[in-house]
Each structure stands twice: as C-alpha cells, then as structure tokens.
Curated annotation (Swiss-Prot):
PANTHER family from the UniProt entry: UPF0234 PROTEIN YAJQ
GO MF annotation: an example: nucleotide binding
Protein purpose: Nucleotide-binding protein.
Keywords (A to Z) from UniProt: Nucleotide-binding
Keyword Ribosomal protein among record annotations: no
Entry's Gene Ontology cellular component terms: cytosol
Listed name of the protein: Nucleotide-binding protein PBPRA2024
Domain of life per record: Bacteria
Protein family per UniProt: Belongs to the YajQ family.
SUPFAM superfamilies (UniProt xref): YajQ-like
UniProt keyword Nucleotide-binding, yes or no: yes
Organism: Photobacterium profundum (strain SS9)
Length: 161
C-alpha cells in the first residue's frame, strides 16, 4: 500500500545563511548606522540584540525576509519575549522542529474529518499516512498543505508504493 510521512523540519544550514545575510544587511543599512545591534545563530536559536524596540522589530523583519529568500517557512519561527537589559533590547528566535503531539492529533483529525480513504497514524514526531491509491494520498497532502489552522509548515517524505 502506498504511504508517506508528514514531518516538520527546518534546514539549519539555510537558517545560518539567512542569519549571515541579515548580519551583512545590518552593516549596510542606514537606519542601523552608529547603533549597537547584532544577530547571531547558536544551536537552533537566533539571538537578536539592539538599542531600541523599533530596531528590534526591524531586525526581525529583515530576518523574516532573508528566511523567505532561503525558502525557510516563517511559520516555523517562534519569537520569544523581548527582554530589556540596561540600554539593550534582546530577543531569542527559535524554530519548531518535529511535530508536537497536539499538532499531530490535529493533523490526524483533519484528515479523518475530510472522509478521505486514507489511514493516518502518529509515529513519534511524524504522521504516517497510508492508502490504497496514490490519488487519495495526494488529496491528503493537499488538505494538510492548505490547512491554515495547523500553524506549522509540513514536508512530505518517505514515499512508498
């Protein structure tokens, strides 16, 4: 029986490239001239520090733009609370890796509510979908890809015929 896995993974090489491009753009932007601002990447976390809250939001939008250019979905990005220490504003940005159990249950429920002729089962941090026909699998892929309520980007791999 044909099957595939639904996963949610981020390519951290592309994230590092986007952070490097953002740091390069930070050096050349006029609104960041004579400003202490930095963006660094370390172990799946991007740390952003600036002198003001406005500059922090600008730097996050620069990062989002560079992530989009590198084809990393911005939905996988989670911005943590902004912290002010002295005259510096700091923010950590984390990336969702894997499918959490609540989200996996929503994916399975969405597929079952659509009344497609497929079976979906949770296997750790991924969801396996099996069906008798490849067309049913493609319908399930389109359903998951177009569902905005899940709030997470998904990739499909491990296709079997």
């Amino acid at each position: 029986m044909p099957s595939f896995d639904i996963v949610s993974e981020v390519d951290f090489v592309e994230v590092r490239n986007a952070v490097d491009n953002s740091a390069r753009e930070l050096k050349t932007r006029f609104d960041f001239k004579n400003v202490e601002a930095s963006i660094t990447f370390d172990k799946e976390i991007v740390k952003i520090t600036t002198e003001s809250d406005f500059q922090l939001t600008q730097l996050v939008s620069i990062l989002r733009g560079n992530l989009a250019k590198r084809e990393v979905d911005a939905q996988s990005m989670t911005q943590k609370d902004t912290v002010r220490t002295g005259k510096a504003w700091a923010c950590n940005v984390e990336f969702k890796q894997g499918i959490e159990s609540d989200t996996a249950k929503k994916v399975v429920k969405t597929i079952k509510d659509a009344k497609l002729k497929v079976q979906a089962s949770i296997q750790g941090e991924k969801v396996r979908v099996t069906a008798k026909k490849r067309d049913d699998l493609q319908a399930a892929m389109a359903l998951v890809r177009n569902n905005e309520e899940l709030g997470q980007p998904f990739q499909f791999d491990n296709f079997r015929d």
